Amino acid sequence: MGFDVVHYNLHKTFSQPHGGGGPGGGPVAVRAEIEPFLPSPLVVRAGDGFRLDHDRPKSIGRVRGFAGPFGVFVRSYAFMLAYGTALKDMSDVAVLNANYLLARLRDVYDLPYDRLCLHEFVLSARTLKREHGITALDVAKRLMDHGIHPPTIYFPLVVPEALMIEPTETETKERLDGFVEAMRSIAAEAASEPETLKRAPLTRPVRRLDEVKAAKDPVVRHAFDHPAEAARIETG
C-alpha cells in the first residue's frame, strides 16, 4: 500500500482478545530500507532454525520490551496463515453486523454519530440518565443478567454515557437479535423499573460493588487470618 511503517492492532481482526480479555498486541512492520535501524537483536533464520543477530551497526540498540507479547504474535500469525484471503470476508461481516445493530438500536438510545459505521459504533444513554437516572454503567450491569458480556462504557470520553458496541464476525443473526432485544428491554425497564437496573446484576454470583465505599474506604492490602502468614509473605 506504499507505507513505510505499519502498526498492526492484533485485536479482533487478527484473533486477539482485548481489554479485560487480553492481552492485545501491536507489532510494527517496516519496509526493507528501514529494517537496519530496528532495535537489536533481530531474530534471523539460521539453517533450519533461528538465531539472535546482534551485529546491527545501524540499529538504534536495545529497547525495553521491544519483543512485546511474543505468544500473541505467534497466535495471530497462525491465524492469518489459516484464513488467508478470507480475513477480508470476515472483516466485511463484522462491519455488516455492527451496522445491523446500529440500525436496530438507534430509536431507543442516543446516536452521537449518525452515519454508517465500520466495525464498531457508539450509543449513548444520555436521555435515559436525564429522564430516568439510568446510566451507561446501569445498562452494562443489567446486560450481565441477560448473559451478555457488557460492552466498553464511558469511551470515547467526549460522548456522555457512552456505550461502544463492537460485534464480531462470528456472531449469528440470532445472537445479534438477542442482544438487540436485551438492549431494548433494558431501555424499557429504565422507565418502568429503574431501581431494578440500579441493583443489577441480580442473577450473577458477584453483585455490584459499593463504589462510593470503595472510593472513600479503599482496601488495598489483603487481610490475612494469621499474622504469621502475612509476615512470611512480606519477608519473602
PLM features per residue range, with description:
Residues 14, 18, 68, 154:
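Active-site nucleophile and cofactor-binding loops and adjacent substrate-binding regions
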